[in-house]
């Protein structure tokens, strides 16, 4: 899976503007398309929601898979993140992802942890920016008007399913709870079900 090859330092960014630029540059490539769909899994879901809610991009449809509207980092760490980022911006904070909570497929787990492009930690300033944007998304989630399908695994402990509760209640959001699923909805035995539900939603919206 990896986290990309472009970054000079994995799991680090000076400001969220770097993320905004990447999203906008990528979205320009599909702006001429008749139907523009944004897909975001996990942290990518948070990025997609932030980009829409801050009017950076305006897709026609949105597909979300376990977006990070919450997490299992200790509250005291999150509360201290801003101060830590100022004092020690490059202090590394370990990832909460482990071999037990990622996927029900052992091969997927092994591939993930053997991939040199996957980072196992983030800097304090990265964490600060992630928390700030997560808060922005949660505070403004009622402003989301884009037709959306939201998937979340019932047994997800990386991004607790309860964090999708407010988003799932919006009229423009179709919510699909994936039973017996960990975080990697599309990379385990739940993949056929998720793809089937996605196909149904795409057909119902006359996208395919």
Name each model feature, range by range:
Residues 53-88, 127:
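Flexible "cap/lid" loop of the alpha/beta hydrolase fold
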Residues 157-163:
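Conserved alpha/beta-hydrolase "acid-adjacent" motif
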Residues 174-208:
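Catalytic active-site module of serine/aspartate enzymes centered on a nucleophile-bearing elbow/loop
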């Amino acid at each position: 899976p990896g986290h990309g090859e472009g970054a000079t330092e994995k799991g680090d960014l000076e400001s969220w503007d770097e993320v905004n630029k990447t999203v906008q540059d990528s979205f320009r490539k599909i702006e001429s398309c008749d139907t523009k769909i944004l897909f975001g899994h996990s942290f990518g879901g948070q990025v997609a929601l932030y980009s829409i809610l801050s009017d950076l991009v305006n897709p026609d449809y949105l597909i979300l898979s376990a977006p990070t509207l919450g997490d299992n980092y200790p509250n005291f760490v999150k509360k201290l993140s801003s101060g830590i980022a100022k004092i020690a911006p490059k202090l590394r904070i370990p990832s909460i992802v482990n071999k037990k909570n990622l996927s029900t497929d052992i091969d997927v787990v092994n591939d993930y942890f053997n991939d040199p492009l996957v980072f196992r930690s983030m800097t304090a300033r990265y964490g600060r920016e992630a928390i700030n944007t997560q808060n922005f998304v949660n505070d403004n989630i009622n402003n989301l008007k884009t037709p959306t399908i939201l998937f979340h695994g019932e047994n997800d402990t990386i991004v607790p399913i309860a964090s999708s509760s407010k988003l799932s209640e919006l009229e423009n959001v179709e919510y699909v709870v994936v039973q017996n699923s960990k975080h990697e909805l599309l990379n385990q035995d739940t993949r056929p079900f998720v793809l089937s539900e996605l196909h149904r939603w795409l057909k119902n919206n006359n996208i395919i």
